[in-house]
């Protein structure tokens, strides 16, 4: 334990908070280009084929990003928008691709939680809601 005199001379060192999403460089989103699009298997006890993409970002980093939702149209050279947010059962995946922006199309036939998956409001549902 330091003496009062030592604290006066040196002071306490502040604990720096380490970023969970360093590739974003403090920005909320970052644009990037897909280099590889593939499926990976999750950690135990889960079992699936999770869709991920390796993305080269404008910040210079190359990161692995999760592709949310059912089905996607991404391939090599697709331009995508990345946000922070890890996938708990995929080690090393700390970013999500934003659906409905750039080359990542929204999820088809999605009715609920549409804003999270980049899906526009369905036309026929809007008309029937107006009649009732």
From Swiss-Prot:
InterPro entries: NA-bd_OB-fold, Ribosomal_uS12, Ribosomal_uS12_bac. Keywords: Methylation, Ribonucleoprotein, Ribosomal protein, RNA-binding, rRNA-binding, tRNA-binding. Transmembrane segments: none annotated. It comes from the Bacteria. One of its GO terms (cellular component) is small ribosomal subunit. GO terms for molecular function: rRNA binding; structural constituent of ribosome; tRNA binding. Residues 106-132 are annotated as: Disordered. PROSITE patterns: RIBOSOMAL_S12. Residues 109-120 have a biased composition (Basic residues). The methythiolated Asp-89 contacts a modifed residue of the 16S rRNA close to the decoding center, and might be important for decoding center assembly. SUPFAM superfamilies: Nucleic acid-binding proteins. The modification 3-methylthioaspartic acid is found at residue 89. GO terms for biological process: translation. Belongs to the universal ribosomal protein uS12 family. HAMAP family: Ribosomal_uS12_B (MF_00403_B). Part of the 30S ribosomal subunit. Contacts proteins S8 and S17. Interacts with IF1 in the 30S initiation complex. With S4 and S5 plays an important role in translational accuracy. Interacts with and stabilizes bases of the 16S rRNA that are involved in tRNA selection in the A site and with the mRNA backbone. Located at the interface of the 30S and 50S subunits, it traverses the body of the 30S subunit contacting proteins on the other side and probably holding the rRNA structure together. The combined cluster of proteins S8, S12 and S17 appears to hold together the shoulder and platform of the 30S subunit. This is Small ribosomal subunit protein uS12. It comes from Thermus thermophilus (strain ATCC 27634 / DSM 579 / HB8). The lineage of its organism: Bacteria, Thermotogati, Deinococcota, Deinococci, Thermales.
